[in-house]
Amino acid sequence: MRARTDNGLTRSLEDYLVTIWELVRNRKVARVKDIARARGVKPGSVSPAMRRLKELGLIRYEQREFIDLTPKGEIVARRVAAHHQILNIFFVDVLQM
């Protein structure tokens, strides 16, 4: 069984969600191939994650269409991104790693 975070997502799904949020914020659109490129994975491995995020009500996704966050997905993505930023600051500034 995969470990889940406090929001019920696996770390991998959290990372996909943040990647979508960053792509939409910076480029206005997210597609499977954009997500695959940003994550360094093959497009075929992105689709199952997108289906799961859609089932959870976090994204709007149809094959061969743009991917967008739902309002709930945006809230979760922002929280995860903020958490990542706090951890980064801690490791870099406090622990000097």
Model-based region annotation:
Residues M1-R2:
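Long, low-complexity, charged/polar intrinsically disordered regions in eukaryotic proteins
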Residues T5-V41:
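N-terminal helix-turn-helix DNA-binding core of bacterial DNA-binding proteins
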Residues V32-Q63:
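Canonical helix-turn-helix DNA-binding module
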Residues E65-H84:
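Basic, amphipathic "hinge/linker" alpha-helix immediately C-terminal to the N-terminal HTH DNA-binding motif
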Residues Q85-M97:
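Amphipathic alpha-helical dimerization/coiled-coil segments
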